[in-house]
C-alpha cells in the first residue's frame, strides 16, 4: 500500500529519511490537515463559509461522469485494492483559515549550515536597519490577513485555465537530512482505519503517487517546523544558530509546497489528473499552508526577535520566499495566481525597511504587485490601504486610501492611523517636489501644484476643520480661484483659451482629471464616515457590520452556535439609528426610509467639501473638452449610481430628499450646456468613426448601455472606479479572473494618472468619451424624469456643415431642464431643513428651460466655441508634427504653437490654392495635407490623385533612411532626377567625411529602391529613364554641376506637362490626376520652383504626411 503519511523517527538524534515509508503514520498537528476518520462525502471544514457543501461539484460540472469529487484523505494512501486511513478534520485556529491559491517551486534551495549564514545570491542587509520599522512592517501581515479572500469552493466552479508553462522538475528530492537542526521529536500515532468511496474514474496512479511522496515530506516538515518555532519562542533564546536551522527547514518546506502545487496543476497531464489535482489543492489547502506555515509562521518568529537579532535571517528568508512564489506564477493558471500577486506585494512591503531604496527598491516591487492584483481583485479595503502606503503618485495614493474605507470589505483604521498615513502621503509629495526641482522646472511646478491640491484637500479631513471658519475660507478660496493656475498665471480652465492651451498642461490635467474627481467624490461621501448621507445611501454601515461580525466569528469560533443579529427597523428613530451605527449591534440590510434619519445625516456632512467638489467640477466643465470629459464622466457615473440606489428605496419622501439634494447641489446648468456643446462639436466633426459609435449605442436604454460597458469597459477613468462602494451600484466587483475590460492596454497605464495613448493622440478615445457622455445624459433624462433633465427634439442644433442631412438625429437632439420647484414633493414642508442646509449651486438659464430655444454654443453664456482662438476640427494636420515627422503629443487638441507665433487658423472658409504666387500657405497646406492623406487611404485603383515627391540632394543626404522607410512601406511615391543622383555620386569624393558617408548611403538607398521599383528615375526632359544609372545626358550637358537646381526644376516642370498632356488624350480621359512636387528645405531653390509654377513643400511636410498615412495604415514610418 502506498501511504501519503510520513513515518516519524522517534529518535531526534537520528536522521530523518523522507524518501522511505512504512506502515506507521505521523500524528498530524496541522490544523489544516485531517486528523481523524472521515468519509469522502463528509462536510468540509466548518469554520469557513465556502465549506458548507458536503462535496465539490467541480469535477461533475467540468467533466460529467468522468471524475467524482475527492474528499480529504484521497492522497493519504491509494492502491488498487486498499483504502488508507484518514483522520477527521478538527477545529482550526486563526492561522489555518487562509485563502487558497497555487504557485511554482525554486529549482534549488540554498545550503545552510547552523554555524554560518546561507550562501544565497543576495547581498547582506545593512546593519543600520531601523528595527522598530522592521517590526512594524512585519506586524501588518497577521494570521488572519487572508482568511476573507479564501474561497476554494468558488474557484472549483470556474473554468479550467491552462498554465503558461510546464514545471520541468516535478519529482521531489528523495532525501532531506535535518538531523543537525532537530530539537524536538515528532510523535508518531496510528489513526483509526477508514472506509471511503473512491472516484468512479481513477486518475493516473503515477500522478497520485507523486503527490503522495511530496505530501509525506510536507507533513513531517510542517510538524517539525511548528515544534521548533514553538520551542524557540518559549525558550526565549537569542542564539542565531537556531534561527538559521529553522530557516533551512522552512526553505525546504516552501520548496516542497510549490513542488506539490506545480505537480497538481501541470497542464500537460490528462484532464482527469488535472481536475483531480485542483480538487486536492482545494481540499488539502496546500496553498493556504504554503502561506501560513511556509511563510507567516517563521516571519512571526522573526518579528519577536527583531529587536535583538541580525536582520540577515529575515532578509534572506523574505527574498527566498519572494523568488520562489514569483517563479511559481509563471507555471500556474491565472485563477490560481491572483491572490499570490497580492502576497508578493506583502512580502515586498515587509522588505522595505530591510534594504535602502538605492540597493533594492522594494517599494517599487510592492507597488507593482499590488497594482497587478488590483487588476483582478476589487472592493478589498486592505489591498487599497496597502498600496496607498507604497504608491509613488501621491494623488493616486490618497484616492486608494479613500477607497480602502469605502468599499465592500472596508479597512477600518483608527483615526490616528488614518491621519498618519495622510501626512505621509503629503510628505511624499513634498519630497518629490524637492527632488524634481533640481532636474526639471516643469516637473517641479507640476509637483508644486499637486502639493497645493493635496494640502487643501487633506486639511478637510482634520477633526478640527469644521470648527475653524478661517481655515474653511482658505480652502474654499483655493479651489475657487487658484486651482488650475500655473506660476505664470495661465489658467487651464479659461474657456476662451480652450483651443490654445499648452499641450503639457492639457496632458497633465487629462491624466489626473479622474483622480481629481475621485478624490473630491471621496471627500463628498465622507471619506469613510458611516453617518454621511452618501454613506447611508450606499450602505457603508451594512458592510462595516459584516466586517465586525466576521472578526467576532473568528474570535469566538470555539463555540458552534452562531450569534443571531436582529434586523434593524428601517423606520426606527433617527437617534437610535445613529447610535446603532456607533455600536454596530444590528444589521443594516435595507436603506432607511425614515426621512428624519436623512435630515439628521446632513449634520454629518462637510459642507465645505461639497462646495469645493462642485467648484472643481464646474472648473472642469469649463475646461478644454479633452480635459473635461474624463472628469465629467466620473461624476456622471456617480450620479447614475445614486439614481440606481434610489430605485431600491420604497419611500417617496426619501426619494424626494435625494432629488432635491441633487438638484440643489449639482451644477446642472453647466452640465446641460456642456452636453449641448458636445452635440454641436460632434456635428461639426462628424466622420465615419464617430457616426459608427453614435449609431451603435444611440438606441440603447440606460440600463443596456451600462450593462454593455460593464462587460466591455474601454475607458481607464471608469475602470479606476471599480471596487468603490458607490460604483457597486453600477457594477459589483469582487475577484474576477477575466475582468470585463475591452481595452487591456490601460492595465499598463503609467503610475502618474491615466495613460494618454495613441487613441487619445488621434482623437479616437475623445469621441468615445463624447458619445458616452451624451448618451448617458440622454439615458438619465429618459429613465429618471423626476430629476428635471429632459431631452428635447424641438430645438434646432447649430451646424456649420451642409453635407449632413437635415433629418440626422443629432441635428435635433438638445438637453433641457425643468424649472426647479422647491414645493415639489414637499407638501408638508418636510424638506425645509434640507433647503436651509444646501443652497442652490447654480441658477438655470432661460435658454436651457425653453424646449424650442437653440442651445448655447459655449458653457460661457453668449459665446461660441467656433469663434474661439485656435478652433479647428479635430484631426491630425500638418502642425501636429515636428520637422522629422514625429507626432507632437496633444497638438491635435491645441493650436498653442500657432497662436504663439501670431497665426490664427480658421478652416471654415479658406480658399484652397493661391494661383497668383503658387504659395502653399498655412491654410492651403492644411487642406492639401488632408486631401492627399484622404486620397492615399484607398487602394491604387481608387486614387483620384497620384503624387510624386522629388527630393533634392541636400534632403537626401540628411534624411535618406527616413525616405527609404516611406518608400519601402508604399506610404508615398517618389521620383528622382538623374541630376540629383549624379550629384550624390559626385559627393562621394568630398573631403568631408560626414558628407562622404551620407552620400554613399544615399546612393546605396536609391539603388535599392530602384531595384524594388519603389522610385522612378527622371531625365532632364521629364521623361522616365530606362535605368537610374543612365549617363548619356550628363556627357552631353557638361555644365550640369553648376546648374543642378535649374536642371531639377526644369525636369519637374516638364514631367508635370507630360502628365497633363496624357490626361487630355482620349484614351486617358478617365485616368487619375498625376503631378510632381519638389521637396526642399533650401529657400532659394524653393523660390525658383515657385517662379516656374511648381508646387513645393519642405521635409517637415513630407514626413508629417508620411506619419499621418502611417497612422491610418498602422505602419511605422520613422
Swiss-Prot record:
Gene name of the encoded protein: ESL1
For this entry, the protein name equals EST/SMG-like protein 1
Q: Which GO terms describe its molecular function?
A: telomerase RNA binding; telomeric DNA binding
UniProt keyword annotation of Phosphoprotein present: yes
Please, what other remarks does the record include?
A: Present with 504 molecules/cell in log phase SD medium.
Where's the PINc domain? 947-1087
Signal peptide stretch = none
Could you tell me where the Polar residues compositional bias lies? 15-27, 78-90, 108-118
Please give the SUPFAM superfamilies that the UniProt record associates with this protein.
Answer: TPR-like
Functional description taken from the UniProt entry: May be involved in the regulation of gene expression responses of environment-sensing pathways.
What keywords tag this UniProt record? Phosphoprotein
What GO CC terms are in its UniProt record? telomerase holoenzyme complex
**Region (Disordered) spans which residues?**
1-62, 77-119
Its Gene Ontology biological processes? Answer: nuclear-transcribed mRNA catabolic process, nonsense-mediated decay
Q: Which lineage do the record's taxonomy fields give for this organism?
A: Eukaryota, Fungi, Dikarya, Ascomycota, Saccharomycotina
- Establish whether keyword Transport is in the entry: no
Q: Which organism is it from?
A: Saccharomyces cerevisiae (strain ATCC 204508 / S288c) (Baker's yeast)
Sorted alphabetically, which InterPro entries does this protein's record hold?
Answer: Est1/Ebs1-like, PIN_dom, TPR-like_helical_dom_sf
**Positions of post-translational Phosphoserine modification:** 170, 190
A Pfam family: PIN_4
Amino acid at each position: 500500500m502506498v501511504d501519503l503519511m510520513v513515518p516519524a523517527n522517534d529518535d531526534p538524534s537520528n536522521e530523518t529519511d523522507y524518501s522511505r515509508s512504512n506502515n506507521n503514520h505521523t500524528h498530524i498537528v496541522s490544523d489544516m490537515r485531517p486528523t481523524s476518520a472521515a468519509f469522502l462525502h463528509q462536510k468540509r471544514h466548518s469554520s469557513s463559509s465556502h465549506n458548507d457543501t458536503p462535496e465539490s461539484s467541480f469535477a461533475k460540472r467540468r467533466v460529467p461522469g468522468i471524475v467524482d469529487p475527492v474528499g480529504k484523505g484521497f492522497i493519504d494512501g491509494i492502491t488498487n485494492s486498499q483504502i488508507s486511513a484518514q483522520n477527521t478534520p478538527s477545529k482550526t485556529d486563526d492561522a489555518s483559515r487562509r485563502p487558497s491559491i497555487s504557485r511554482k517551486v525554486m529549482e534549488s534551495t540554498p545550503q545552510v549550515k547552523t554555524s554560518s549564514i546561507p550562501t544565497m545570491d543576495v547581498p547582506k542587509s545593512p546593519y543600520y536597519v531601523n528595527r522598530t520599522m522592521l517590526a512594524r512592517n512585519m506586524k501588518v501581515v497577521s494570521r488572519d490577513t487572508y482568511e476573507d479572500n479564501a474561497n476554494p469552493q468558488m474557484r472549483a466552479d470556474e473554468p479550467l485555465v491552462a498554465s503558461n508553462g510546464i514545471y520541468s522538475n516535478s519529482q521531489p528530492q528523495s532525501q532531506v537530512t535535518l538531523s543537525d537542526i532537530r530539537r524536538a521529536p515528532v510523535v508518531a500515532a496510528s489513526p483509526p482505519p477508514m472506509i471511503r468511496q473512491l472516484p468512479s474514474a481513477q486518475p493516473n496512479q503515477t500522478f497520485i503517487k507523486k503527490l503522495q511522496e511530496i505530501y509525506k515530506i510536507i507533513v513531517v516538515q510542517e510538524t517539525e517546523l511548528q515544534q521548533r518555532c514553538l520551542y524557540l519562542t518559549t525558550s526565549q533564546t537569542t542564539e542565531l544558530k537556531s534561527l538559521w536551522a529553522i530557516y533551512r527547514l522552512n526553505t525546504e518546506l516552501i520548496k516542497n509546497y510549490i513542488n506539490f502545487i506545480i505537480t497538481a496543476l501541470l497542464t500537460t497531464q490528462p484532464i482527469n489528473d488535472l481536475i483531480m489535482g485542483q480538487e486536492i489543492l482545494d481540499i488539502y489547502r496546500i496553498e493556504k499552508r504554503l502561506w501560513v506555515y511556509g511563510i507567516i509562521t517563521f516571519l512571526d518568529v522573526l518579528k519577536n526577535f527583531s529587536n535583538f537579532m541580525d536582520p540577515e535571517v529575515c532578509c534572506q528568508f523574505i527574498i527566498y520566499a519572494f523568488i520562489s512564489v514569483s517563479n511559481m506564477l509563471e507555471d500556474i493558471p491565472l485563477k490560481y495566481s491572483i491572490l499570490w500577486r497580492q502576497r508578493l506585494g506583502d512580502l515586498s512591503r515587509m522588505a522595505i525597511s530591510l534594504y535602502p531604496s538605492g540597493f533594492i527598491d522594494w517599494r517599487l516591487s510592492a507597488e507593482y504587485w499590488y497594482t497587478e492584483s488590483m487588476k483582478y481583485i476589487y472592493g478589498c479595503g486592505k489591498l487599497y490601504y496597502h498600496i496607498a502606503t507604497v504608491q509613488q503618485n501621491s494623488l493616486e495614493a490618497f484616492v486608494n486610501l479613500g477607497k480602502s474605507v469605502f468599499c465592500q470589505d472596508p479597512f477600518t483604521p483608527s483615526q490616528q492611523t488614518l491621519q498618519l498615513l495622510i501626512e505621509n502621503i503629503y510628505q511624499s509629495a513634498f519630497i518629490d517636489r524637492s527632488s524634481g526641482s533640481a532636474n526639471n522646472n516643469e516637473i517641479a511646478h507640476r509637483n508644486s501644484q499637486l502639493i497645493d491640491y493635496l494640502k487643501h484637500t487633506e486639511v478637510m479631513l482634520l477633526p478640527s476643520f469644521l470648527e475653524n471658519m478661517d481655515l474653511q475660507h482658505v480652502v474654499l478660496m483655493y479651489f475657487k480661484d487658484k486651482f488650475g493656475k500655473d506660476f505664470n498665471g495661465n489658467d487651464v480652465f479659461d474657456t476662451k483659451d480652450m483651443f490654445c492651451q499648452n499641450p503639457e498642461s492639457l496632458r497633465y490635467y487629462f491624466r489626473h482629471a479622474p483622480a481629481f474627481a475621485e478624490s473630491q467624490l471621496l471627500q463628498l461621501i465622507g471619506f469613510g464616515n458611516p453617518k454621511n448621507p452618501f454613506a447611508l445611501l450606499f450602505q457603508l454601515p451594512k458592510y462595516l457590520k459584516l466586517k465586525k461580525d466576521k472578526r467576532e466569528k473568528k474570535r469566538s469560533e470555539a463555540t458552534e452556535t452562531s450569534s443571531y443579529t436582529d434586523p434593524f427597523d428601517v423606520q426606527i428613530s433617527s437617534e437610535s439609528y445613529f447610535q446603532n451605527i456607533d455600536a454596530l449591534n444590528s444589521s443594516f440590510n435595507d436603506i432607511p426610509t425614515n426621512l428624519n434619519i436623512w435630515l439628521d445625516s446632513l449634520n454629518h456632512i462637510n459642507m465645505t467639501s461639497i462646495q469645493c467638489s462642485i467648484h472643481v467640477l464646474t472648473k472642469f466643465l469649463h475646461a478644454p473638452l479633452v480635459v473635461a470629459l474624463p472628469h465629467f464622466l466620473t461624476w456622471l457615473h456617480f450620479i447614475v449610481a445614486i439614481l440606481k440606489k434610489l430605485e431600491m428605496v420604497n419611500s417617496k419622501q426619501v426619494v424626494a430628499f435625494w432629488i432635491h439634494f441633487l438638484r440643489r447641489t449639482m451644477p446642472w446648468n453647466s452640465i446641460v450646456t456642456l452636453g449641448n456643446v458636445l452635440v454641436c462639436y460632434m456635428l461639426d466633426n462628424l466622420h465615419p468613426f464617430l457616426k459608427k459609435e453614435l449609431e451603435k449605442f444611440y438606441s440603447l436604454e440606460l440600463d443596456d448601455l451600462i450593462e454593455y460597458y460593464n462587460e466591455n469597459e474601454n475607458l481607464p477613468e471608469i475602470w479606476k472606479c471599480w471596487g468603490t462602494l458607490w460604483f457597486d451600484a453600477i457594477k459589483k466587483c469582487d475577484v474576477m479572473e477575466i475582468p470585463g475590460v475591452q481595452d487591456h492596454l490601460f492595465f499598463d497605464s503609467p503610475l502618474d494618472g491615466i495613460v494618454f495613448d495613441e487613441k487619445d493622440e488621434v482623437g479616437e478615445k475623445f469621441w468615445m468619451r463624447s458619445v458616452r457622455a451624451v448618451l448617458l445624459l440622454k439615458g438619465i433624462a429618459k429613465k429618471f424624469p423626476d430629476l428635471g433633465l429632459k431631452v428635447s427634439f424641438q430645438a434646432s442644433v447649430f451646424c456649420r456643415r451642409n453635407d449632413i442631412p437635415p433629418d440626422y438625429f443629432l441635428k435635433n437632439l438638445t438637453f433641457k431642464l425643468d424649472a426647479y420647484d422647491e414645493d415639489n414633493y414637499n407638501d408638508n414642508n418636510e424638506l425645509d431643513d434640507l433647503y436651509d442646509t444646501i443652497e442652490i449651486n447654480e441658477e438655470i438659464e432661460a435658454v436651457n428651460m425653453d424646449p424650442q430655444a437653440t442651445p448655447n454654443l459655449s458653457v460661457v453664456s453668449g459665446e461660441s466655441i467656433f469663434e474661439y482662438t485656435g478652433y479647428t476640427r479635430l484631426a491630425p494636420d500638418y502642425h501636429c508634427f515636428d520637422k522629422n515627422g514625429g507626432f507632437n503629443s496633444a497638438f491635435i487638441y491645441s493650436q498653442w504653437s500657432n497662436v504663439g507665433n501670431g497665426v490664427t487658423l480658421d478652416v471654415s472658409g479658406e480658399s484652397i490654392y493661391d494661383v497668383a504666387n503658387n504659395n502653399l500657405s498655412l491654410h492651403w497646406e492644411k487642406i492639401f495635407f488632408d486631401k492627399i492623406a484622404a486620397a492615399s487611404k484607398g487602394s491604387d485603383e481608387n486614387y483620384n490623385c497620384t503624387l510624386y515627391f522629388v527630393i533634392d540632394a541636400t534632403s537626401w543626404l540628411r534624411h535618406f533612411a527616413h525616405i527609404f522607410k516611406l518608400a519601402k512601406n508604399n506610404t508615398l511615391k517618389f521620383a528622382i532626377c538623374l541630376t540629383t543622383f549624379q550629384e550624390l555620386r559626385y559627393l562621394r569624393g568630398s573631403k568631408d567625411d560626414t558628407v562622404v558617408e551620407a552620400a554613399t548611403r544615399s546612393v546605396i538607398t536609391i539603388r535599392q529602391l530602384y531595384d524594388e521599383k519603389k522610385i522612378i528615375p527622371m531625365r532632364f526632359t521629364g521623361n522616365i529613364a530606362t535605368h537610374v544609372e543612365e549617363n548619356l545626358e550628363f556627357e552631353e550637358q557638361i555644365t550640369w554641376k553648376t546648374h543642378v537646381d535649374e536642371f531639377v526644376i526644369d525636369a519637374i516642370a516638364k514631367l508635370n506637362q507630360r502628365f497633363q498632356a496624357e490626361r487630355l488624350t482620349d484614351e486617358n480621359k478617365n485616368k487619375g490626376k498625376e503631378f510632381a512636387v519638389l521637396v526642399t528645405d533650401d529657400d532659394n531653390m524653393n523660390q525658383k520652383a515657385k517662379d516656374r509654377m511648381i508646387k513645393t513643400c519642405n521635409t517637415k511636410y513630407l514626413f508629417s504626411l508620411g506619419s499621418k498615412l502611417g497612422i491610418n495604415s498602422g505602419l511605422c514610418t520613422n
